[in-house]
Amino acid sequence: QRQMCIRDRDKPVEVSSQDGVALGCETHVDSGIMTILYQDKKGGLQVQNRHSLDWYDVPHDPNALVINTGLALEYLTNGQMKATNHRVLFNQEERISIPFFFEPSYDFILDPKHLDIYENINYNIDNYENFLTNSLKKFVEYDRPA
């Protein structure tokens, strides 16, 4: 079952504990293989350098799409490709962001052996449905009573 989410832009989702910045979308990595993203000229997307932990604005380019690597790809490559840690700054102005989430089927096993990686596996091997269910728990939209 697929779900759609529209975020309320009238108030921040949270304030970053790292630097006190108001966020329209909390700091996270995407769950899937990759995300292809169109963002309008309002921007707001930031990516984090995994070594310095500094944040960098992703500039708007009308002729380009943004590609974020996801956590499932990190698992499949046994960490050789890292998921992109990112966030969206809070802005009350209307902002258009259109993501396409490239994800495997729910029964796909996230196993590095699919890519001929057999040694020193660093991640738990599971099917994508269980992996996704656990990954989505970090988002406020999914934090509601059963």
PLM segments and residue spans:
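Short catalytic-site patches enriched in acidic/histidine residues
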Residues: 7-44, 50
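Short, small-residue-biased leader/transition segments that mark boundaries at the very start
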Residues: 1-6
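Catalytic core of Fe(II)/2-oxoglutarate
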Residues: 22, 38-134, 142-144
